[in-house]
């Protein structure tokens, strides 16, 4: 089949790489415009664009597809002229109007990083960890105009481990998503079968995965240790959990475990021990967490042994 692929980050590039190994023809790739990145703020192509260029696939980077503007209408017409059988969308980042969704012969299929209708929206991986879900997965759906509202065609399941961060779970789901879309697109007959058997989402089970904001990542010591640990893992690798030491300086916290230490009448935020495991801190409900990797402003992330050597934190200190 002739496939258009639309995606931007690594999650999408993993799926594109898998599709490139099939007998299908990737006739075009759509991705977001190049963005400034790194210390030099150089314009950098997305991971999907880089992969497409390596395979000499034409790359399109429209700003939008709004028919109300000349450029949006031109982008729609350009896509239609490609004559695709199907369009695969994974973390593309642009809203696709109904006119685009209806253009390919079999419509547009989306690779979504959750078990829909749970965690529709921008941050399904992070919200699943922060909420304490014990399982997530991939849903392949036929796209509709609403936000992740399309009919479901295929699901795979992925347990969430107690040590999973958004970074590790992202990689697991990216691999699952790649396998899932290849299964659905094994042949034109397979695609027709999954389209015929697609399932409407139960709106009563809908939960939204709202976009992350940096302020959420500030650690609240009044929460119990289990929730603090979930948040630390959910916000790794972005925006990274932090302790606001003073107005201008934040201590980033990359990893943690539930502490086996305890102290009677400890104040929330109080450091009760520093040892080879890390920095043990009192949380709400008389629970305790151990910070195992932290990063001071301008420095590198440190492990437990390195944290102790800095002597920047001390037992009895109350973290804000």
UniProtKB/Swiss-Prot annotation:
Enzymatic reactions: L-methionyl-tRNA(fMet) + (6R)-10-formyltetrahydrofolate = N-formyl-L-methionyl-tRNA(fMet) + (6S)-5,6,7,8-tetrahydrofolate + H(+)
Keyword list, A-Z: Protein biosynthesis, Transferase
Cellular component GO terms, alphabetical: cytosol
Pfam families named among the record's database cross-references: Formyl_trans_C, Formyl_trans_N
KW Protein biosynthesis (keyword) present: yes
Protein residues bound to (6S)-5,6,7,8-tetrahydrofolate: 114-117
Family membership: Belongs to the Fmt family.
NCBIfam families the record matches: fmt (TIGR00460)
Name this protein carries in UniProt: Methionyl-tRNA formyltransferase
Organism listed in the record: Acinetobacter baumannii (strain AB0057)
Source lineage: Bacteria, Pseudomonadati, Pseudomonadota, Gammaproteobacteria, Moraxellales
